């Protein structure tokens, strides 16, 4: 009996180790070029976790906004310099960037939370990004404000004191614009009436990270941004003058993902990276490393997290198919209105 028990335990250990290193069985090469919109700490999490499984594969990172990275991929189409991209590819993109990427998704997409699997057969979705207001609480107090809702952003005291990125090139800005439309009614008169009023207080930045960094530094009172960026500053000790708040009217999230660049030089390594990130093992590693990111794999183990529990946030339903189908028209309307309001 003791021998049987010992053998059973040994087999269980072998199975567990095999499962944890399932992606390490293949030779994927020693080089991988990653284009990414993610933060430095996000990249640290991905690289350190991936290299535990594939220690011989060196990842070179090229960072930029989604507009910059996709433009670069398009310009390099005849001789691709990148292999895979992470971040900025949103579930509302539709087929906008389809010609840039391989028609391939990770098998792990089948394990995504319902509603957050691949939207187009090209993106493998790995994490969620929820909209928040980044607020400099010292400046807010000086102005005598208590900023909680979208209506609060229209206060004349905030003219030129709200920073927002460009929704034409920033997925974070598009995410926030989608949330406004989810609250006020998609491409409705009420939505555009609100947006026109909001534009009077906005300063548009080329960088989505400025929408939390420059708020924390005191250059702006409010930034319309995303929780995983803002929470990192709080984690680093900025909570004595900086906070993030979910819109009292309701918050929603975009799913963001990865895609393999068409005709890339290292497809095996690119697919191995996507598979690992989207797996329960990869999602759990990144979530526990960062403590600031919500992942898509339904089997993610979070451990300690700095983010509030899902049930503590007021959520609003986002009509992703509608926003995807009408994205070009919405952006055209945004551009025309911004020119009219700000000149």
Question: What do the predicted segments below correspond to?
Answer:
Residues 8-16:
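Bacterial N-terminal signal peptides
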Residues 110-111, 129, 193-198, 204, ...:
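Periplasmic-binding protein-like
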Residues 316-343:
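Conserved C-terminal helix/tail region of periplasmic/extracytoplasmic solute-binding proteins
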Residues 252, 256, 261-318:
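Mature extracytoplasmic/periplasmic domains
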Residues 33-44, 67, 80-219:
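Extracytoplasmic ligand-binding site segments that recognize negatively charged/polar headgroups
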Residues 6, 25-84:
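Conserved N-terminal structural module of periplasmic/extracytoplasmic solute-binding proteins
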